[in-house]
């Protein structure tokens, strides 16, 4: 019997015991302006900032966010050093990386992966009703790249 739910070339059937305690901790995205990005992820999406780490010698900041129900929110330590360790033990964190000064550079742009050459596509959030969520996003001023029924993929 296979350990996978689907078949595809390249799947490994044997689990290396050394990976048993691995967790998927984070996806990292580079951002231009933390004020804009943090507003979107906390006000519009409802995420919570769990850890902010400044690297002044290298001039960048990391922001670790998550949906409160996706992490062990009740046990997040108050102490920032302990919360760093806690952050790296959680599941489904979003890491936003801001390189200082990019927010003031009008010509600066990160490649979004959707224009050529394509690469990264998106991160996804499940919502109870995609149309109701989209209406809420519009009321809150979110600019859509593609609405739920635009393009080939619907809903």
Predicted regions located by residue number:
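Vicinal oxygen chelate
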Residues: 1-20, 26-29, 53, 108, ...
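Core segments of cupin and vicinal oxygen chelate
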Residues: 18-22, 29-93, 132, 139, ...
């Amino acid at each position: 019997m296979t350990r996978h739910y689907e078949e595809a070339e390249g799947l490994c059937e044997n689990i290396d015991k050394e990976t048993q305690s691995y967790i998927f901790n984070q996806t990292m995205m580079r951002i231009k302006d933390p004020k804009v990005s943090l507003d979107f992820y906390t006000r519009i999406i409802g995420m919570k900032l769990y850890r902010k780490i400044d690297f002044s010698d290298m001039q960048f900041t990391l922001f670790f966010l998550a949906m409160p129900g996706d992490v062990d929110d009740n046990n997040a330590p108050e102490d920032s050093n302990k919360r760093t360790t806690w952050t790296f033990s959680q599941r489904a964190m979003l890491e936003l990386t801001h390189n200082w000064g990019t927010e003031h550079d009008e010509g600066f742009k990160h490649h979004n992966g959707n224009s050529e050459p394509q690469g990264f596509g998106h991160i996804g959030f499940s919502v109870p009703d995609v149309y109701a969520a989209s209406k809420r996003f519009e009321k809150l001023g979110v600019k859509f790249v593609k609405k739920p029924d635009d393009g080939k993929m619907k809903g």
